């Protein structure tokens, strides 16, 4: 194992839940304002998850005031306090970019049954 792989293994976070595209999640992000630090919740649907060790990231989309907002989070970021999986969605694609063009009821995702 070379030095780069060893450094990436040290930076990995093992406390993240298992989720994938289509899942509705809440991301608790640490926001620093001046000398204060607070937690802000970004809730939405995962539309993309890229794999990798230290460079893994995921994109969450939500509708805020009738406008779609997407935010990209590094999975191993220290600014993420925790991730909650609200519902598990059933989709047939790993990247669900088609949600960007859908509105209203058409943008709903069926819930995956956990057996």
Curated annotation (Swiss-Prot):
One GO biological-process annotation of the entry reads: translation
The function of this protein is: This protein is located at the 30S-50S ribosomal subunit interface and may play a role in the structure and function of the aminoacyl-tRNA binding site.
Query: Molecular function terms in GO for this entry?
Result: structural constituent of ribosome
This chain belongs to the protein called Large ribosomal subunit protein bL19
The set of disulfide-linked cysteines is none
List the Pfam families hit by this protein, alphabetically: Ribosomal_L19 (PF01245)
Gene Ontology, cellular component aspect: cytosolic large ribosomal subunit
Q: Which family does it belong to?
A: Belongs to the bacterial ribosomal protein bL19 family.
Q: Which organism is it from?
A: Desulforapulum autotrophicum (strain ATCC 43914 / DSM 3382 / VKM B-1955 / HRM2) (Desulfobacterium autotrophicum)
- From the UniProt record, list the coiled-coil ranges: none
Q: Which residues cross the membrane?
A: none
Keywords for this protein = Ribonucleoprotein, Ribosomal protein
């Amino acid at each position: 194992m070379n030095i780069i792989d060893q450094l990436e293994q040290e930076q990995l976070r093992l406390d993240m839940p298992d989720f994938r595209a289509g899942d509705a999640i809440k991301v608790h992000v640490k926001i620093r304002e001046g000398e204060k630090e607070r937690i802000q919740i970004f809730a939405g649907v995962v539309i993309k998850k890229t794999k990798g060790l230290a460079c893994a990231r995921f994109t969450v989309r939500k509708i805020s005031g009738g406008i779609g907002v997407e935010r990209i989070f590094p999975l191993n970021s220290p600014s993420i306090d925790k991730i909650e999986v609200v519902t598990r969605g059933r989709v047939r694609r790993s990247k669900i970019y088609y949600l960007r063009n859908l509105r209203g009821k058409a943008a709903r995702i069926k819930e995956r049954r956990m057996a």
